[in-house]
C-alpha cells in the first residue's frame, strides 16, 4: 500500500504567492490534480522529467516576477538543472489533463506559454515551516 504524499510548499514568491513543488511522480499527481484549482498556474520543464510546480492564485493573475521565480524552481527540480537555461512550459492548471490509464505524473496540455529560466534558486525565499 502506498503512503499518500503531501504537497509541499517550497517557496514564497517575492510578491507573496505560495509556490508548491511535487518531488516525485506521486506528489506531482497529488499536487496537480487534487490540490491545485483551475486558475492556479502550473509549470514544468519542456520535454524532460521534472517536478510539477504550482503557484496558488485566487483570480489567475500573477506578476511577471512570480512567473519567473516559479519557472526557476521548475528548472531547478528538472533533469536540466545543470544547464545554464531550461525551457519551461506554463499554463493555468485547468488546461492540464491526465490521460486515462496514464502513469503517475504524466500529463498532457495544449496552448501553453514558455519561458527560459535559469535553474538558480539561491535568492528565493524557502519555506522552513
Locate each region found by the language model:
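Short, small-residue-biased leader/transition segments that mark boundaries at the very start
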Residues: 3-8
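Phosphate-backbone binding interfaces of nucleic-acid-interacting proteins
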Residues: 12-20, 27-129
Amino acid at each position: 500500500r502506498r503512503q499518500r504524499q503531501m504537497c509541499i510548499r517550497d517557496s514564497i514568491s517575492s510578491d507573496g504567492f505560495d509556490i508548491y513543488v511535487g518531488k516525485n511522480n506521486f506528489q506531482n499527481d497529488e499536487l496537480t490534480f487534487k490540490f491545485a484549482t483551475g486558475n492556479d498556474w502550473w509549470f514544468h520543464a519542456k520535454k524532460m522529467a521534472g517536478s510539477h510546480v504550482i503557484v496558488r492564485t485566487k483570480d489567475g493573475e500573477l506578476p511577471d516576477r512570480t512567473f519567473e521565480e516559479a519557472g526557476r524552481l521548475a528548472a531547478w527540480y528538472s533533469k536540466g538543472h545543470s544547464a545554464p537555461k531550461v525551457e519551461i512550459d506554463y499554463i493555468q492548471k485547468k488546461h492540464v489533463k491526465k490521460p486515462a490509464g496514464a502513469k503517475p505524473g504524466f500529463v498532457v496540455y495544449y496552448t501553453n506559454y514558455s519561458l527560459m529560466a535559469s535553474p538558480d534558486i539561491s535568492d528565493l525565499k524557502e519555506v522552513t515551516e
